[in-house]
Design a protein with these regions (language model features):
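An alpha-helical, amphipathic repeat domain used for nucleic-acid recognition
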Residues: 1-192
């Protein structure tokens, strides 16, 4: 923390203090002070970007939005995102692949994976490639139905289980295939 004679207090990273050679009693011109403020803003945005990326998978757009939401100047946020991209710490394609892999591990359907990509603000240009690798979820659906229906199930339990699968992003046709494998398909089940 640096305190100026006029009472202004600035929280600076050690690197910024060293870059400007700050010490007690240093006289600064207005121009030097403005450069210090700009450098402090840049460093703040970069360090916050590093913390965000270390905590979760984010796209370029999502990182910039989060930096601005946390109080960073939009210019500093944009520069910090570009700095992270240049250092190959933010890669939208890699993030999209990680999101889809996480959805597969959780047993979500393609619709839920698309929703996750949208929520993370992944550009749509990457969606087709990463979703093309999505495996068939019929075995997962069958396993889910077997685990949640048990022996003494009725129409109400079947309806709940299929609704849960729909919420998890599986399509009617995929659920229909799972029901057919278990010989549980009823005439009431919709086509799509």
């Amino acid at each position: 923390m640096v305190r100026f004679d006029d009472g202004t207090v600035m929280r600076l990273y050690k690197q910024t203090v060293q870059d400007f050679g700050l010490y007690s009693g240093l006289e600064m011109t207005d121009e030097e002070f403005q450069k210090l403020c700009t450098a402090a803003g840049d460093m703040s945005a970069k360090m916050r970007a590093v913390r965000i990326v270390a905590a979760s998978n984010v796209s370029r757009q999502d990182l910039q939005r989060r930096l601005i939401h946390k109080g960073e100047d939009s210019t500093h946020a944009k520069d910090a995102v570009q700095w992270m991209v240049d250092m190959q710490l933010v890669d939208d394609r890699r993030t999209a692949e990680q999101i889809v892999q996480k959805c597969i591990q959780k047993g979500y359907g393609v619709s839920r994976a698309k929703q996750a990509l949208y929520e993370k603000r992944i550009p749509k240009e990457y969606w087709d490639d990463v979703l093309a690798q999505y495996p068939d979820q019929t075995d997962h659906i069958v396993s889910y139905l077997q685990n949640h229906l048990g022996d003494g199930w009725g129409e109400k339990e079947l309806h709940r289980a299929t609704d849960a699968l729909l919420c998890r992003g599986h399509s009617y046709s995929q659920i229909r295939q799972g029901l057919e494998q278990l010989s549980l398909l009823t005439e009431e089940f919709p086509e799509e």
